[in-house]
C-alpha cells in the first residue's frame, strides 16, 4: 500500500517511511508485517493509522514539494507531535505545505498563512 508512492523503492526505504510516520510497531504487530494486505480503502485500519499511512506514502514519494492536508488529524496530541517532528526533520531541502486546523507543527514553519472566514 505504501509502496504505491514509489514502486521501485527498496524494503529498507519503505520501512524508513513507515518508521518516520510512527507506524513501525503497528506494522510489526500485523500477521505478515509489511506484506499484510490491509484491505481496499483501508477498511481495516483506524483513522489515525490511515493518516499515518498517507504520510508514509508522501515521504516515500520523495518529491520536491510535500503537500500534507491534515496530516495529524485523528492522532492523539503526543503522536501528532512526534509525527510532525519526524516529517519536518525529513525536509531535505523540499518545500512543505502543511494544511491544518490545529497548531501542532506550525512552530517549525518558516511561514504561516492563516485563513479566516
Give residue ranges: language-model regions:
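Helical segment within the ABC ATPase nucleotide-binding domain
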Residues: 80-92, 104
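Conserved catalytic segment of ABC-fold P-loop ATPases
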Residues: 107-114
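Hydrophobic anchor residue at the start of the ABC signature
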Residues: 55
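A short, proline-enriched helix->beta-strand linker immediately N-terminal to the Walker B motif
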Residues: 60-64
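Conserved H-loop
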Residues: 93-101
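ABC ATPase nucleotide-binding domain helical subdomain, centered on the C-loop/LSGGQ "ABC signature"
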Residues: 1-40, 84-85, 93
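Catalytic Walker B motif of ABC-type/P-loop ATPase nucleotide-binding domains
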Residues: 66-70
